[in-house]
Regions:
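C-terminal peripheral helix-coil segments that are non-catalytic and often amphipathic
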Residues: 1-38, 132, 169-177, 207-236
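Short, structured helix-loop boundary elements
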Residues: 44, 48, 69, 91, ...
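Generic hydrophobic, amphipathic alpha-helix propensity
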Residues: 44-55, 72, 97-105, 167
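Helix-turn-helix
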Residues: 50, 54, 58-92, 96
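Short, hydrophobic secondary-structure boundary micro-motifs
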Residues: 68, 141-145, 153, 179-183, ...
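Hydrophobic alpha-helical connector segments
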Residues: 96, 110-136, 190-193
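Amphipathic alpha-helical packing segments from all-alpha helical-bundle domains
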Residues: 103, 152-179, 187-195, 202, ...
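Amphipathic alpha-helical segments used for helix-helix packing
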Residues: 133-153, 202-203
């Protein structure tokens, strides 16, 4: 009888130089290394401004999934290497730029509230600043409307205690003084206020309305005030 030949060892039984078994299929390493990017403070202000304009232009007109880093680089007229150096990936570019835009809004709002004591006047000023932002930054409003609610935490300003407290202090003070509705928790009153602004802002931009929102400010504030103030005050 001819001698039987033993079968060669399968790939799963072979060993590599380290003595570990080899696999016929390489397993993908699912571990990810956090991106290390350069501080944004090191980027030239003029370059950052160009990136901001590009982000607002591109993301306002298209779905975020359709935008690429190459498009952002070309529109901003900066190198792709620069984008990766300071941001690392597309999502970080978007969230960082939106944080800068909203950060300026926060600073302006807090500046305008200085020295105003009346609850109604403080609420009026807060609404005016927000609506003025919608009128002057329609592209930013569109970009924000496309950010998933689950991703809002990626925009740092949404966790900015100074900004949130600036909003809440106006409403909390109003409740304590017996001016604003106190039959619901403070956060519900805050949601009513933000929902009013958000809906107005998004629809104003979608409709491409020619007249700015603040052209009807008195009427809009009256609606908001009646919804948030105690009935006996709103009817005065």
């Amino acid at each position: 009888m001819p001698p039987t030949r033993s079968k060669p060892p399968s790939n799963s039984n072979r060993k590599n130089k380290t003595g570990q078994p080899k696999s016929s299929k390489l397993k993908k390493d699912t571990r990810t290394t956090p991106l290390v990017v350069a501080p944004l403070s090191e980027m030239r202000p003029a370059t950052l401004e160009k990136v901001e304009k590009a982000v607002r232009l591109l993301f306002a007109d298209s779905d975020a999934s359709d935008i690429t880093m190459i498009q952002i680089a070309k529109t901003a007229n900066v190198s792709l290497q620069t984008l990766y150096k300071y941001f690392g990936d597309k999502q970080t570019v978007l969230y960082t730029i939106m944080d800068l835009v909203l950060g300026r809004l926060a600073t302006r709002m807090m500046d305008h509230l200085q020295g105003i004591d009346s609850v109604e006047d403080r609420l009026r000023k807060t609404l005016w600043v927000c609506l003025d932002f919608v009128d002057t930054h329609p592209d930013a409003v569109m970009v924000l409307s496309k950010v998933s609610i689950a991703r809002f935490h990626n925009i740092a300003i949404y966790n900015n205690k100074e900004l949130i407290n600036a909003f809440l202090s106006v409403l909390e003070d109003g409740q304590k003084r017996g001016v604003l509705v106190d039959t619901v928790p403070l956060h519900i009153l805050f949601d009513v206020f933000m929902g009013f602004i958000s809906r107005l802002g998004i629809m104003q931009t979608i409709r491409q309305a020619e007249a700015p929102l603040n052209a009807n400010f008195d009427a809009l504030f009256s609606i908001l005030w009646r919804s948030m103030s105690k009935p006996e005050l709103s009817d005065l």
